[in-house]
């Protein structure tokens, strides 16, 4: 579910723009180099490319030494093929060998001076890499973690969905239907609050006195992970705003408690800035998961709460009021209620919910017959001649 103003807060997935820019600048610099000195350009470019790939290959050998000596059994079960795939890229090795063969077949002879240049390039690469100068930038690390779904937020979002929302939301619909027989709910959906600062109070009344606990829905009891009849409870709250009172099912996203407590532990290496980014990623990931879930579709509402509301004691009730008002204009489709066609009046009948027309059937003749129609001009306008649509013919029959 979308929340008003979320585009200004929730980060979008990163695009391929850096790769495209790097490729464009690479071709541009190659063109400039060729214009400056076109003498043996392909030979010099091949030698430089071979040197760059060689230094990366030597660094991968250093990675291989670590994996072979200390991690071959625990991480790879002694399988050398997996160790090599983890340390080397097949495309890099093939590219280096292909460039070397092309240079040799092209008649290029590597002199002692050129090998000395290769040694200096490899030495400089090793030293700079060991000092962290050539390491990935924070943006690159973030991009890799997001692309591989390796962030804390990804795990928490999937855990919240698989371990709670996936089975709770379909079952909650039954409780809401029973509750609505005796009391009115402003919305049948579960409203999940996600504060950006990850500070989750034990009671919403602590944040806003206009949000008051009303009562609990009947418990949902399931056998989960060895616990017999584990109880899951949802609460109904009354929200007052501008002398209007609304009621809805409300709760905070409990995984945000984990993010907040991690930021308080020095061993977690999780600062306030990282915590906010993880909350936004949690919101984005959970939204994508729930949007693609048939069990949860149209049964929830994610409400992202901006923490820039210091001094407003009724911020929460105002946000809930706006979301509930926004839902008033939406059509809530109950997937359990099937829509049946309405039968038309007249010769059209209804059989098991399907429209069925009745026509007068005549016995078919075995003798072939010829049917002729009156000739019409090819340029004439089409005229409806059936009795149903032609009032003149209908009047003649009457």
UniProtKB/Swiss-Prot annotation:
Q: Give residue spans on the Lumenal membrane side.
A: 38-44, 113-120
Q: Show the stretches that span the lipid bilayer.
A: 17-37, 45-65, 92-112, 121-141
Chain segments carrying region Disordered:
375-398
Keyword list (alphabetical) reads: Cytoplasm, Cytoplasmic vesicle, Endoplasmic reticulum, Golgi apparatus, Immunity, Innate immunity, Ion channel, Ion transport, Isopeptide bond, Membrane, Nucleotide-binding, Phosphoprotein, Transmembrane, Transmembrane helix, Transport
Kindly list the GO CC terms recorded for this protein: autophagosome; autophagosome membrane; cytoplasmic vesicle; endoplasmic reticulum; endoplasmic reticulum membrane; endoplasmic reticulum-Golgi intermediate compartment membrane; Golgi membrane; perinuclear region of cytoplasm
Name the Gene Ontology molecular function terms of this record: 2',3'-cyclic GMP-AMP binding; cyclic-di-GMP binding; proton channel activity
Per its database record, what is this protein's job? Facilitator of innate immune signaling that acts as a sensor of cytosolic DNA from bacteria and viruses and promotes the production of type I interferon (IFN-alpha and IFN-beta). Innate immune response is triggered in response to non-CpG double-stranded DNA from viruses and bacteria delivered to the cytoplasm. Acts by binding cyclic dinucleotides: recognizes and binds cyclic di-GMP (c-di-GMP), a second messenger produced by bacteria, and cyclic GMP-AMP (cGAMP), a messenger produced by CGAS in response to DNA virus in the cytosol.
Protein name per Swiss-Prot or TrEMBL:
Stimulator of interferon genes protein
UniProt source species? Danio rerio
């Amino acid at each position: 579910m979308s929340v008003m103003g979320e585009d200004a807060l929730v980060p979008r997935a990163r695009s391929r723009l850096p790769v495209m820019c790097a490729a464009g600048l690479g071709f541009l610099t190659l063109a400039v180099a060729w214009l400056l000195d076109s003498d043996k350009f392909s030979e010099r470019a091949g030698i430089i490319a071979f040197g760059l790939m060689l230094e990366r290959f030597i660094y991968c050998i250093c990675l291989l030494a670590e994996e072979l000596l200390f991690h071959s059994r625990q991480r790879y079960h002694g399988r050398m093929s997996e160790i090599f795939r983890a340390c080397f890229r097949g495309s890099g090795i093939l590219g280096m060998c292909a460039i070397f063969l092309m240079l040799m077949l092209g008649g290029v002879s590597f002199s002692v001076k050129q090998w000395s240049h290769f040694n200096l390039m490899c030495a400089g690469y090793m030293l700079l890499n060991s000092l962290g100068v050539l390491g990935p930038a924070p943006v690159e690390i973030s991009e890799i973690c997001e692309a591989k779904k390796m962030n804390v937020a990804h795990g928490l979002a999937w855990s919240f969905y698989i371990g709670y929302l996936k089975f709770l939301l379909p079952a909650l619909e039954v409780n809401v239907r029973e509750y609505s027989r005796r009391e009115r709910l402003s919305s049948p959906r579960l409203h999940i609050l996600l504060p950006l600062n990850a500070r989750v109070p034990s009671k919403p009344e602590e944040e806003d006195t206009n949000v008051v606990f009303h009562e609990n829905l009947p418990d949902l009891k399931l056998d989960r992970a060895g616990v017999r009849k584990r109880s899951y409870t949802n609460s109904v709250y009354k929200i007052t705003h501008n002398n209007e009172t609304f009621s809805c099912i409300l709760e905070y996203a409990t995984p945000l408690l984990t993010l907040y407590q991690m930021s308080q532990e020095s061993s977690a290496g999780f600062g306030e800035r990282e915590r906010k980014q993880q909350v936004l990623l949690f919101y984005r990931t959970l939204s994508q998961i729930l949007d693609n879930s048939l069990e949860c579709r149209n049964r929830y509402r994610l409400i992202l709460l901006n923490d820039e509301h210091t001094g407003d004691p009724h911020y929460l009730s105002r946000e809930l009021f706006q979301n509930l008002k926004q839902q008033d204009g939406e059509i809530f489709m109950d997937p359990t209620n099937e829509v049946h066609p309405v039968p038309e009046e007249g010769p059209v009948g209804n059989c098991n919910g399907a429209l069925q027309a009745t026509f007068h059937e005549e016995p078919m003749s075995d003798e072939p017959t010829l049917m002729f129609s009156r000739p019409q001009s090819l340029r004439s306008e089409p005229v409806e001649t059936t009795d149903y649509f032609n009032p003149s013919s209908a009047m003649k029959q009457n």
